[in-house]
Amino acid sequence: MALVSMRQLLDHAADDSYGLPAFNVNNMEQVKAIMDAARATSSPVILQGSAGARKYAGEPFLRHLIAAAVEAYPEIPVVMHQDHGASPAVCMGAIKSGFSSVMMDGSLKEDGKTPADYDYNVSVTAKVVELAHAVGVSVEGELGCLGSLETGKGEAEDGHGAEEALDHSKLLTDPDEAAQFVKATQCDALAIAIGTSHGAYKFTRKPTGDILAIDRIKAIHQRIPTTHLVMHGSSSVPQELLEEIRTYGGDIKETYGVPVEEIQEGIRYGVRKVNIDTDIRLAMTAAIRRVGAKNKSEFDPRKFMAAAMEEAKKVCIARFEAFGSAGKAEKIRAIELDEMAKRYASGELAQVVH
């Protein structure tokens, strides 16, 4: 199956009331673990590359790894998504490289650190939407900044994220402003701020409504029912993985992620894309530490990475099943990007705003 537009997958998810984990990838082992999990569960896949991943692996390597996944797993619909594009130029570069979906994160200025104003965000996002939709590529925007409601601070990850203290007007997306934003930009998906943040250190305690505003999702979805909501920074940070890392010599302080049941609640209210990176990192790190501790003479990196892939695969299977995407791959027939471009041009995919 060819690469597909993220809009196609998220439309299907909305019609069938499920969510899709979007996994960040940096190397072959992560791609293979995710795709093996997708095959085991018959789930469609969103593979995404962050700015850090593009810097680490290089965009050509990421692009060809994902192309290999499409070839090796022909029964699985795959989206190749560029995560957190810092400018229209970055997004256009990704489109030219063959990405089928891009994110224009205009919540921050081009440096990826300074919070931007609303008008700037609308301007750059609308520009990317116009150019991307002309070739059938979907666009994710962002309104509000990722950050902790506990500390009032953003969380930089992979070279992207607000570095200054933020007030609640930035840390929580306003439903009325979300409606205005979607009407002005016509983005396909919208990343919203509800108290999540990148990285492993999201919450100092199991999150409740005062630090994780799941109820905000419902209010936003009521205003923009056809725009697919996105939860960034939504790894669950499994406590058993933290404990295993500590058991085999790691030093990770107490921390909590976004509980799976809270994500499931978000899916009921319109979340369709759930970004996950840290959980895979933790799974692979735990496996590598375990192999090294139990086999001190081992020096074949394949032994370490095979165990890491298997541990990551378990996490991915669990998320596909928990979010409801298992069993959906065979129900999807790929729509070519040229056809998506025609649908955008006809107005068929215009967003509904209340």
Swiss-Prot record:
Gene Ontology BP, a term: reductive pentose-phosphate cycle
Positions contributing to D-glyceraldehyde 3-phosphate binding: S50
Pfam families for the chain: F_bP_aldolase
UniProt note on regulation of activity: Activity is stimulated by Fe(2+) in autotrophically grown cells.
Biological pathway: Carbohydrate biosynthesis; Calvin cycle; Carbohydrate degradation; glycolysis; D-glyceraldehyde 3-phosphate and glycerone phosphate from D-glucose: step 4/4
Its EC number(s): 4.1.2.13
List of residues binding Zn(2+) 2: D105, E142
A molecular-function term among this protein's GO annotations: fructose-bisphosphate aldolase activity
Keyword Membrane found: no
Cofactor field: Zn(2+)
Residues that hold dihydroxyacetone phosphate according to the record: G199, G233, S234, S235, N275, I276, D277, T278
Residues reported in the UniProt entry to bind Zn(2+) 1: H84, H198, H232
Function per UniProt: Catalyzes the aldol condensation of dihydroxyacetone phosphate (DHAP or glycerone-phosphate) with glyceraldehyde 3-phosphate (G3P) to form fructose 1,6-bisphosphate (FBP) in gluconeogenesis and the reverse reaction in glycolysis.
Protein family: Belongs to the class II fructose-bisphosphate aldolase family.
Entry protein name: Fructose-bisphosphate aldolase
Gene name of the record: cbbA
